[in-house]
Amino acid sequence: MRFRMFSRVSIWVAVVIVASSCSKFRRISKSEDWRVRYEAALNYYAKQDYYRASMLFEDIMPIVRGLPEGEKVEFYLGYCQFYEKTYLLASNQFKTFYETYGRSSLAEEAHFMYAFSLYSSAPSANLDQSDGIEAMDAMQNFLNKYPDSKFQERAAEVIRVSQGKLEEKGFQNARQYLTLRMYQAAIISFDNFRKNFPDSKYLEEIAYLKVVSQFNLAEKSLVTLQPKRYRAVIDLYQELVDSYPESKYLRDAEKMYSLSLAKVTEKKEVKS
């Protein structure tokens, strides 16, 4: 019984507090003195109430533009949007800031946060990486402009992770052709991947998958095309062995190599 009464009292108190808070915010937002709204916005920001802070910052931004307070309002608004996870809004706000206040002591941080907001908006590796490419370019531009920045390590990490996502997506796309049994397209895609990512962790697997793709292509080819394509399997197998003599894929690749060798030998015997 006491517990129920305590629960009801607690709920009632919570409702009163929320109602009071909303009422206070409404009074502040309707104040004709922008300084009242400005100080309240800073207070909400300090308390990590970024939603209310952003509403007040946006409200007074046209009024304070050109005043000393205007710089802080536009800068903090970017962070409010970032913490609210509206990353594209944040990136646009930070970009506007450093373009408008290029000589500000906060311009460097705003430039970094512009790129970091783009990076934060980029999806996982299995989805389209257009935003990731834009974020990587933006962060590289930041490092070019501020090579000794205190954000240098974080910027380099963003580029590294973004590059990793692009690499992962590129590998998935290339392997998809093999899954779809589009073997010639798979081989071309694997070659393009190696050119684009010469230091990739997937190069060994790609060398093996090229053998798989070429072997399947030969198997499905017209009889007249098979000798040349089986010889290509043999060449790709040799490349795999030369590049990765301890590869875990060698046993499986060797089976395709042996079958291809037998097919080529068989064709020669028939010809003779």
Give the positions of each predicted feature:
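Acidic, polar-rich low-complexity tracts and alpha-helical solenoid repeat scaffolds
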Residues: R2-F6, V18-S272
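Sec-dependent N-terminal signal peptides
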Residues: V9-I17
